[in-house]
Swiss-Prot record:
Gene3D superfamilies (alphabetical): 2.30.30.30
Function: One of two assembly initiator proteins, it binds directly to the 5'-end of the 23S rRNA, where it nucleates assembly of the 50S subunit. One of the proteins that surrounds the polypeptide exit tunnel on the outside of the subunit.
One of the GO biological process terms: translation
Keyword Plastid assigned: no
Gene Ontology terms, MF aspect: rRNA binding; structural constituent of ribosome
Name of the protein in question: Large ribosomal subunit protein uL24
PANTHER family in UniProt: MITOCHONDRIAL RIBOSOMAL PROTEIN L24
Gene label: rplX
GO CC annotation, single: ribonucleoprotein complex
Organism taxonomic ancestry: Bacteria, Bacillati, Mycoplasmatota, Mycoplasmoidales, Mycoplasmoidaceae
Record-linked HAMAP family: Ribosomal_uL24_B
PROSITE patterns in the cross-refs: RIBOSOMAL_L24
Keywords: Ribonucleoprotein, Ribosomal protein, RNA-binding, rRNA-binding
InterPro entries the UniProt entry points to: KOW, Rib_uL2_dom2, Ribosomal_uL24, Ribosomal_uL24_CS, Ribosomal_uL24_KOW, Translation_prot_SH3-like_sf
Family indicated by similarity: Belongs to the universal ribosomal protein uL24 family.
Length: 110
């Protein structure tokens, strides 16, 4: 089960992009990867055609493994730091909660 969803703020915990943070653009659970805004940038040489208006060297985000990402705690004394996630039942619905501060992670998405 993925604990990271689209729109979450995450921080990279290992690799060349360590300590960089950004918002998740897309999650691919089958491949266990995610696209994070501003993290793991690559350069691609691209020709101009009907689908791509720009030509030349394009910089874009590359997928990064989910095991290298951790959710950022939105509140509490550890605001902005990595946290683990636990699930609680609230009104017969599963809610994601930050382990460090105990704040709900899905509350601001509605």
């Amino acid at each position: 089960m993925n604990r990271i969803k689209k729109g979450d703020t995450v921080v990279v915990i290992s690799g060349k992009n360590k300590n960089k943070s950004g918002v998740v653009i897309q999650v691919n659970p089958k491949e266990q990867t995610a696209l994070v805004e501003g993290v793991n940038k690559i350069k691609r040489h691209q020709k101009k055609d009907q689908t791509h208006e720009q030509s030349g060297i394009i910089e874009k985000e590359a997928p990064i493994r989910l095991c290298k990402l951790a959710l950022v705690d939105p509140k509490g004394k550890d605001k902005g730091k990595a946290t683990k996630v636990k699930y609680l039942l609230k009104d017969n619905k599963k809610v994601r909660v930050a382990r460090k501060s105990g704040s709900e992670l899905d509350a601001n998405k509605k």
